[in-house]
Amino acid sequence: MSSSKYKRVMLKISGEALSGKKGFGFDFDVTQRIAKEIKEIVDMGIEVGAVVGGGNIWRGRNGEEMDRTTADYMGMLATCINALALQDSLENIGVKTRVQTAIEMKEVAEPFIRRRAMRHLEKKRVVIFAAGTGNPYFSTDTTAALRAAEIEADAILLAKKVDGVYDKDPNKYDDAKKFDKLTYIEVLEKGLQVMDSTATSLCMDNNIPILVFGLDKPNNIKKVIMGEQIGTIVSK
């Protein structure tokens, strides 16, 4: 067993992270590395739920000339492709996994049923939640916050391409300042790019800490679980 203070976590992985340096599609070396890092914490006794974004395949802003609802549904389907890719990488290394979707597609995945998801987690299966909330106008960040509340996760691990939360884009500004700790209110008031305001508010209302870190370096998921200060913690 681990000495982590977290028993059950929700891992949110951006779709872009799966594309690595390619910027689109999949970098399977990255997908396999993420799977190995998830296996590490599963082997420590941590129960893991996961939500993957769809930005490596489709982003709503790509469809500016489209109906917003249609564009959002396309994004939801993109997350299903990513969920199946992650499931495959996990099962190839012996991690028992289930994909649950908010839009029914029973030939490829289970429908989202909270009690069933909880049972899978108790049996040490990784549960990947796909197709967002099943509704347009909600991001995968909101999905992660909602599912985290539903499965009673102790924290959200927010894996991004940057290594924490900054006051401005560190890729554009050399003087960008990184925060070690923030409150939910500070994130909302400053308009910081952590999660969108709906997701942040959900975490605040349910007292779910958000641990923001970069996926660029190996073993960061385990480091965050073990309490190493490598990113930004958002809490009360």
Curated annotation (Swiss-Prot):
Transmembrane parts of this sequence = none
Q: What is its EC number?
A: 2.7.4.22
Q: Any idea where this protein resides?
A: Cytoplasm
Listed NCBIfam families: pyrH_bact (TIGR02075)
InterPro entries (alphabetical)? AceGlu_kinase-like_sf, Asp/Glu/Uridylate_kinase, Uridylate_kinase, Uridylate_kinase_bac
Q: How is its activity regulated?
A: Allosterically activated by GTP. Inhibited by UTP.
A single Gene Ontology biological process assigned to it is: 'de novo' CTP biosynthetic process
Enzyme class comes to transferase
Q: Which family does it belong to?
A: Belongs to the UMP kinase family.
Keyword Membrane (UniProt): no
Single GO MF descriptor? ATP binding
Assembly and interaction partners? Homohexamer.
Give binding positions for UMP. G54, D72, T133, G134, N135, P136, Y137, F138, S139, T140
Where does it primarily localize? Answer: cytoplasm
- Any idea which positions bind ATP? K12, I13, S14, G15, G55, R59, Y166, D169
Pathway per the UniProt entry? Pyrimidine metabolism; CTP biosynthesis via de novo pathway; UDP from UMP (UMPK route): step 1/1
* UniProt GO cellular component terms: cytoplasm
Q: Give the record's keywords alphabetically.
A: Allosteric enzyme, ATP-binding, Cytoplasm, Kinase, Nucleotide-binding, Pyrimidine biosynthesis, Transferase
- Species of the source: Clostridium novyi (strain NT)
Is Kinase one of the keywords UniProt gives this record? yes
Q: Which reaction does it catalyse?
A: UMP + ATP = UDP + ADP
According to UniProt, the name of this protein is Uridylate kinase
Region annotated Involved in allosteric activation by GTP sits at: 20-25
